[in-house]
Design a protein with these regions (language model features):
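Short, surface-exposed beta-strand/loop micro-motifs that present aromatic residues
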Residues: 161-163, 171
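A residue-level signal for beta-strand positions that form part of recognition/binding surfaces
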Residues: 41, 84, 170
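Amphipathic alpha-helical segments that form well-ordered structural scaffolds
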Residues: 23-26, 30, 132-140, 163
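General alpha-helical segment detector with a strong preference for membrane-spanning helices
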Residues: 8-10, 95, 164
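Alpha-helical metal-binding/catalytic segments enriched in His/Glu/Asp
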Residues: 1-54
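Short, well-ordered alpha-helices that flank and scaffold nucleotide-derived cofactor binding pockets
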Residues: 25, 29, 33, 62, ...
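Metal-dependent peptidase/peptidase-like ectodomains
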Residues: 47-158, 167
């Protein structure tokens, strides 16, 4: 579960991506509570240099991909880099994706009333798995956050899940 910490300094950084960073930190706080258990390890990551080329996420993928699922030290039962099952990137959480274009029209991929936009990349090697993950979250959102309707889009670009999208389901 990730977000990027950097932003442009002319006013948008609180949303792009201070909002995503705050959400990831809150999720980490909640999931680290003693009474919360999960069946899988959840890694929380805050990337840097997204605005200048996804450099932090690319560095992580390049440095850690080959280490997935390798026990270290051998026989310890410890896996410093768990096998990746998916990536959930939070970017611009306060953006109103339902706003119409300047001419008043809406994107075909977004509902006019959508407050949550869940995107995957349809050209990724694992696009089918990413699409399933996106619709899983959309369906969960429809069930648990009925005041915040969600839409799924298939043109995810230029965010920190991009370096992962050919290796795991990424939204």
């Amino acid at each position: 579960i990730g977000a990027h910490m950097d932003g442009h300094g002319w006013g948008e950084a609180a949303n792009d991506d201070g909002s995503g960073t705050a959400l990831v930190m809150e999720l980490a706080r909640v999931f680290s509570m003693p009474d919360v258990t999960t069946e899988r390890t959840i890694r929380f990551a805050l990337w840097n240099n997204e605005e200048t080329g996804l450099n932090g996420a690319w560095a992580y993928v390049n440095q850690r991909k080959a280490l997935q699922g390798i026990e270290n030290p051998k026989g310890s039962g410890k896996y410093p880099e768990p096998k990746w099952l998916g990536v959930i990137q939070h970017d611009m959480m306060m953006w109103d994706h339902g706003m119409p274009r300047a001419d008043g029209s809406f994107s075909a991929e977004q509902r006019p009333e959508a407050d949550v936009n869940i995107e995957f990349q349809s050209t990724a090697k694992l696009a089918d798995q990413a699409m399933k993950l996106a619709f899983f979250f959309r369906d969960a959102n429809e069930k648990y956050a009925t005041d915040y309707p969600a839409a799924v889009g298939h043109h995810m670009t230029n965010t920190d899940s991009t370096p992962f999208m050919d290796d795991v389901a990424a939204v």
